[in-house]
């Protein structure tokens, strides 16, 4: 594995992989508008908001992505419990896409992951993937803090087989906790074994063309060092609720 030189990682490179997130139930449209403005100014790659906040309307170019690129819009499905029927998750995801979402972060049935029931996970995730085919980006939240190593590896394999674009650690809402370096490292190791691990800094088009899968670490990433820890462990996206603080802006 290539040595990771933290000193060479730029603020711009990290900003480009940030999903600036606002999923609090009390968030208003004004709060979301402020999030979009800040994310745009910081050069973040995406914002992640609740489905009820869609559509967002006109979204300005994001500085880190070039003058012709716009901030990507992500939302959630089956959130935060994952205890929705598969068809409900799929319908929620498809409707969000119709309202302008570019990316869907869907929560798995964690009970199936705990049971290492790969068939159940596959059935659910394939249903959602079919509802939001490429070029829509599908990120699968596995709630990694609840899973032991083999359960986590099983979930990662199911995500890959179902055609997910990213495996995501956490909702950030479960009391078990959010992302950890250990969990991200396990996820990266499993993707590496499958020949599917996307490297840090790879563009979306290049990742899709190569058939690789990224890792989104989310939950508890509050500063620059924590962000670099996750990237070093294998994360290629970071979900954060305080992007300016993470970037030291």
From Swiss-Prot:
Pfam families noted in UniProt: DeoC (PF01791)
Species of provenance: Corynebacterium jeikeium (strain K411)
Membership in a protein family: Belongs to the DeoC/FbaB aldolase family. DeoC type 1 subfamily.
Predominant location: cytoplasm
Protein name: Deoxyribose-phosphate aldolase
One GO location term (cellular component): cytoplasm
NCBIfam families with a match to the protein in the record: deoC
Protein's cellular compartments: Cytoplasm
E.C. no: 4.1.2.4
Cystine pairings recorded for this chain: none
Pathway of action: Carbohydrate degradation; 2-deoxy-D-ribose 1-phosphate degradation; D-glyceraldehyde 3-phosphate and acetaldehyde from 2-deoxy-alpha-D-ribose 1-phosphate: step 2/2
Reactions catalysed according to its record: 2-deoxy-D-ribose 5-phosphate = D-glyceraldehyde 3-phosphate + acetaldehyde
